[in-house]
């Protein structure tokens, strides 16, 4: 079960999430609806560890996900594919690629092989141009 308890998050002193709590049971499907800027993407990115939360707790079963990249927690079993095929500049190229693998429950053997051939994949996206 995914348990979110009282999470809050801010960007540049602007509160984006304030005291968000919800429980999602295994097998349950949840849709997030809201206007632009309501915090839907921030909530999803918070669950994935891509956005820092200021307070509260995010747990999947007994694993606390706060401030961790979800794809680095094997027992987590969740992935996130951003709309519009966006990448995350704060992550390494390798981590961006792994996001898609975890979302599809795919093996990362091919990715590990590619990473061994191209060391540039171990650098952060924001260090790249073009």
Spans of features found by a protein language model:
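ATP-binding/catalytic-site motifs of ATP-hydrolyzing domains
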Residues: 57-59, 63-64
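The feature captures the beta-strand-to-loop junction immediately N-terminal to the Walker
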Residues: 33-35
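ABC ATPase NBD coupling module
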Residues: 64-85, 111, 125-129
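Short beta-strand immediately N-terminal to the Walker A/P-loop
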Residues: 30-31, 80
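Conserved structural motif at the start of ABC-family nucleotide-binding domains
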Residues: 2-4, 17
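ABC-type ATPase nucleotide-binding domains, specifically the catalytic core motifs of the NBD
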Residues: 12, 68-70, 93-109, 119-122, ...
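Helix-to-loop junction immediately C-terminal to a conserved catalytic motif
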Residues: 48
């Amino acid at each position: 079960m995914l348990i979110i308890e009282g999470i809050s998050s801010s960007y540049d002193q602007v509160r984006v999430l304030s005291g968000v709590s919800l429980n999602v049971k295994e097998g349950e499907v949840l849709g997030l609806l809201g206007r632009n800027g309501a915090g839907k993407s921030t909530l999803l990115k918070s669950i994935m560890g891509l956005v820092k939360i200021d307070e509260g707790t995010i747990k999947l079963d007994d694993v606390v996900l706060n401030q961790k990249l979800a794809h680095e927690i094997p027992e987590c079993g969740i992935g996130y594919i951003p709309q519009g095929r966006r990448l995350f500049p704060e992550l390494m190229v390798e981590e961006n690629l792994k996001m898609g693998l975890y979302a599809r429950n795919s093996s990362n053997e091919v990715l590990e092989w590619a990473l061994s051939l191209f060391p540039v994949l171990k650098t952060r996206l924001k260090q790249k141009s073009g």
